[in-house]
Swiss-Prot record:
The keyword Lyase does not apply. Pfam families: LpxK. PANTHER family: TETRAACYLDISACCHARIDE 4'-KINASE, TETRAACYLDISACCHARIDE 4'-KINASE, MITOCHONDRIAL-RELATED. GO terms for cellular component: plasma membrane. This is Tetraacyldisaccharide 4'-kinase. ATP binds at T55, A56, G57, G58, N59, G60, K61, T62. It catalyses: a lipid A disaccharide + ATP = a lipid IVA + ADP + H(+). It comes from the Bacteria. Belongs to the LpxK family.
Length: 328
């Protein structure tokens, strides 16, 4: 229902306009206060790169963060990552992730990023505290990447990158809750890079596609082409589950059942195992896998995806960030 409201297909969005105007007024006032220096943002002693979006829901930010961290690491840059830690609840903040940190403590995305990149990752509702925690334990970190947080103006940033869903883009264009917008589309004029996940990019936007890898067994880590799996039940607890189901079909998989779950939904063995019957195979997103690995069964697999950015702009962006991190 919410997708129909935000896309404009349902007329119910008009009933929510008063709340949207209030949201826009408050969020605009907050940004203006920081712009006029009526409120002061905390500036880290190292460069900060924000990877965020203008809309609620999944746009592909986390794969971009992983891509960015890995690309900078390949260039010899030591990167730290901070996040709000949505969906997690730690005993205290900031929380610096370790191999024992669970998604219940830190949230799905931070654990995924930590496992994929081995970079220092910290979470806190106050992102500046997360940055301080990383730099205290890892003083060699040269640059901070923040997963989400475009609207978290308490943390000063040197580079802003916005990720857009190229198919849904901005829906009906209204602020939350009548539409999907956290900020209006005009905000794109002030950011450093706009990355478009799928769809048809517009002038100045960097095209990106999510490339699926081989399916990975949660229990033993073996890999195979996902098309080789039979009697598949697909599960996705991400911001936009239909994207994952479409990816499976693109890979030649016709799921017997597709199960969309809420983003950041907590999972347990009983609920997940109930999704599949004898002889069926469960295929989930990598984001779901970080929550299920501890209690996985032999017929549970996940499909990792990697961001692939096209054109000349990604190389220019990486050169800019490498120069910033190196102090040049």
């Amino acid at each position: 229902m919410i997708e129909k409201i935000w896309s404009g297909e349902s007329p119910l969005w008009r009933l929510l306009l008063p709340l949207s105007w209030l949201y826009g007024l408050v969020s605009g006032a907050i940004r203006l206060c920081y712009k006029l220096k009526l409120k002061r943002a905390w500036r880290a002693p190292v460069p900060v790169v924000v990877v965020g979006n203008l809309t609620a829901g999944g746009n592909g930010k986390t794969p971009v963060v992983v891509w960015l961290v890995e690309q900078l690491q390949q260039r010899g840059i030591r990167v730290g990552v901070v996040s709000r830690g949505y969906g997690g609840k730690a005993e205290s903040y900031p929380l610096l992730l370790s191999a024992d940190t669970t998604t219940a403590q830190a949230g799905d995305e931070p654990v995924l990023i930590y496992q994929r990149t081995d970079a220092p990752v910290a979470v806190s509702p106050v992102r500046s505290d997360a940055v301080k925690a990383i730099l205290a334990q890892h003083p060699d970190v040269q640059i901070i990447v923040t997963d989400d947080g475009l609207q978290h103006y308490r943390l000063a940033r040197d580079v802003e990158i916005v990720v857009i869903d190229g198919v849904r883009r901005f829906g009906n264009g209204w602020w939350l809750p009548a539409g999907p917008m956290r900020e209006r589309a005009g905000r794109l004029k002030s950011v450093d890079a706009v990355i478009v996940n799928g769809g048809v990019p517009r002038s100045g936007e960097i095209p990106m596609h999510l490339l699926p890898g081989q399916a990975v067994n949660l229990r033993i880590g073996t890999r195979c082409d996902v098309a080789q799996l039979e009697h598949v039940v697909a599960m996705a607890g991400i911001g936009h589950p239909p994207r994952f189901f479409a990816t499976l079909k693109m890979c030649g998989v016709q799921p017997e059942k597709c199960v969309p779950l809420a983003d950041h939904q907590s999972l347990n063995h009983a609920d997940v195992s109930a999704l599949v019957s004898a002889g069926q195979t469960l295929v989930m997103t990598e984001k779901d896998a970080v929550k299920c690995r501890a209690f996985a069964e032999e017929n549970w697999w996940y499909l990792p995806v990697d961001a692939q950015l096209s054109g000349d702009e990604p190389a220019k962006l990486l050169t800019q960030l490498t120069s910033l991190a190196s102090g040049n």
